Amino acid sequence: MSAKNYLATYAKSFNWAGFFLPKDTYKKCSALYDFCRVADNIADDENTITVKKEKFKKFKDNFENKNFTDPIIKNIWDLIYENNISTKIIHDLFDGINSDIKEQVKLNTKKELLIYSYRVAGTVGLMMAKILKVDKKNSLKSAINLGIAMQLTNISRDVIEDLNNNRIYIDQNFENIKSTIQLSEEFYENSFYSIKEIPLSFRFSILVARRVYRKIGYKILNKKNFENYKKSGKIYVNNTEKIVET
């Protein structure tokens, strides 16, 4: 697997949940996250749009051409082969990331918000489920729902940061933030129904990730208004809260 652990660096809530996975499974989940993070970082870095498009095209070409000199590419293809992951899921992820490589991003409807959330996060939940040996259709749908729920949490948390990057996924007022958290709750609830289908050795880790990430939404709601929300900076779950939620 890749030398740099992006999961530990960028996704501390997920990394905490990953602590409860078997070591080999954690490595596979980490390799998946590495691939998604490297792709996403291209859209998020400070280069010009032209440079970002060139870098993203090169990354996609490396994937399509199976450039195994890049460990990130080799690892994702190993996961695809081992877990029977459809490349359509990867292409859906690419579509989501590509939609962020613009001078300005603006989503106008709930449908657009949910499509975007599926592409950049529901896909990841689906691939993660395949790694965790989940194969029933309803269970895979629950994995997509959990990914969407977490992305809606991200969007609700990062309104100011996204605006500074010329991205408007939801309007900048607390009512919209609150309604997005409420929408995420529907997806968190729907993600729970098939949890029993996850193999027992993996189940606790997914429950922890779900509880810890959901907690972010509750903390956002506790800000009560947009002024408090703006003053709070990036809202996260601290280590003590993670232990409590676990």
Predicted features by range, described:
Residues M1-L152, S156-T246:
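Catalytic cores of Mg2+-dependent Asp-rich isoprenoid enzymes
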